Swiss-Prot record:
It comes from the Eukaryota. Residues 189-209 have a biased composition (Basic and acidic residues). The gene is OCA5. Keywords: Cytoplasm. Residues 100-460 form the Rab-GAP TBC domain. This is Oxidant-induced cell-cycle arrest protein 5. Its main location: cytoplasm. It comes from Candida albicans (strain WO-1). Residues 1-66, 132-209, 353-377, 503-522, 555-583, 636-670 are annotated as: Disordered.
Amino acid sequence: MLQTSKGSNSSSTSSSRSASISTATPNTIVEDEELLCGPKSELTPPAVANPLRPVSKSNTSVEDDSKPSFTYDLDVFNLCKEYLNTRNHHGLALIARQKGIPPILRFKVWPILLKSHPFVISPFIQPDSELLNESTSSRSNSSSSSSTGSNTPLSTAPGSIKDAAIIDGDANDNDNDSNSNSNDDDNDRDNNDANTKEKEEDEQNNKIREKIKRDLAKYIQRLKYSQSKYTVSETEHEILSILENAIMKFTLKWGKIIKYDSSLTWIALNLAEWFPPIPKTPWVLVGKEYSSSHQSLIVNFLDDYSNYIDNIPDLREYLERLIYHDEKISTISFREVYERLVLVLLHCPQPVSRRKKSDNQGQNQRRNQSEVQKDQQSFKVNKTTLPKTGGTIEERVSYFIYCLRKLIPELSQYFHEEQILTKFGCLDDEWLIWWLKFCGTKVWSKYDRGRIWDFMLGWRLKNPKRDFNYYYEKLNYVNRNTLEKLGPDIFWSVGNEEEDISGDNNVDANANEINNTEKTETGKLVKREGDIKRSSFKDLVNELSNELHISKRVSTDEVATSTSSPATTKMASSSSTSSTLTPNVSIPFSRVDPHVALIFISLSLLKSKENILVELDQHEIRQFLSRLPSKSYKYNQKRSTRQKRISYASNASSTSNSPMGQSPVDRDEDSIFPTSRIVISNDSKDQKHKVNFIDNIISEAGELWRKWLWSEMVEDN
């Protein structure tokens, strides 16, 4: 827990870098956390003169095996740099949701994405039930007191003595003196009430600040569990002070909607693992992946990716300019980034009653509580609207359990036998809240969480009023081949490319007729004029495909001079009107709500750990899911693992009758891992360190989404 002076409560980032912080002592951690240490173990502050040097005394103390895996297509990386230099949030959002932002650029990209995020522009956070009840009771008390005051006799109402004297017309000097004394008494009473209220607020704020300090100290204790005593350095103290002030200011601003919870501190801590809290420095928190014997709580974020940086000429110089000299791209403070990130992670759709009220502002009558609950119940079970609109945390948890039973029945049955999800809401099952409500905060690996947050921060829907040319211009007319490398939306559904082509004005009626016939014969679900009986899930598929996908036809000459994707090539060659149905350029947009997508990502993570989970008991499972290790495997096993995946995908596509089991690209090795791509890797030369494949987890989440959608459509028929 940090010791801060009373005047630092409202201090800014600049004020937190005062002389008082530079004289940090072992007293910066309190005894009740058992983290006190003697001066002998006090850390040497990181050298400021050479901030790119690792905090550790030598590079040899950190093995290559501890470096995270990172491979990234060079063309996409250069495109990301181009969009960053021009602050192009359209292009950065596209890369973020499709491939993820390079970790070494997140500290500049995330602020740009957050500034333009729909959930920041139109924020809505689900209010805490306790605060909601307090607000309702206070309004009712205020209403009753006002009605009581209106029925009070005039002579006893505040300020009524003067009015009564004027009405009576017989007021004398004594009456005036009495009136003056009464007004003075009223003013004194109001001042006393205001002072009392201010003191209560100060006491409440002090309690919140103490909770924040205690949670920050728990983070240190969690990382340094093998050390009974630990002292923070000057730089660490400054970083933790910035975090404390950011959390406190957010709580003061949004305290009437949500009360302080430890999750707010953990969001700040996890943000500080990628975004340096101190401006113009590379220092970030290390995260739980580092050994408890690591000398410091902070690390230079460039050190983890030194192999990748050294493989690209002039990249290190470019990053140093971004860190120390940038005044144009992004200079936003940690506090502002933190507030916007919380608005995205904790966002939920407005209740039905609130949406209707905003649409009909002239109607002032409130719906009673039973009607609102009825609407929420109907929305809770409406699986055709939840994927698009999202829902409250209660609705998402119910949806998660439903999908778990449907998509991973064996694991679901084991969870049922072990009673893993039967005590939802208790401390035993709080891992699920951290997964779904707080988007992996605290419980996931920083590397997995960073990639998933990339996906959520890059979430964008297509504006139906904008055409292809508008977005293509916003992307600065990106090269077709580079755009193809980004691939389709992860949560794609059937009928997107084909429907766009069949609906194009350049295609004649015969081509449309042939196209529709082919779709029907192959099981592709397409809206036809003659259909009478239609499934609600078919409507959902068509709605997702038509509204959230945008593409434009490419002429035959352009196709001849450019490389087509496997999906569009296969589609064009299979059609009898290939001369007309030429491949198209696609700009993928988000299709499902990001928090619903997070549900399928969570299911994919559980599926990847299934073999481990079935070997554990109740307590071990909950502990494991509360500190989920990074999904990784040895680099020298990558080849065999890849072959297994390809074999499994091939068998699944040949045995499955579901058209959703087929990917928009061919499932051969060359299409999954094209040899023509220039991919720069952070891998060590000995190829023995672990490789993170969270991208595969996210891709598997898309497969689970299509599997769920297909099964629901079959049952709906």
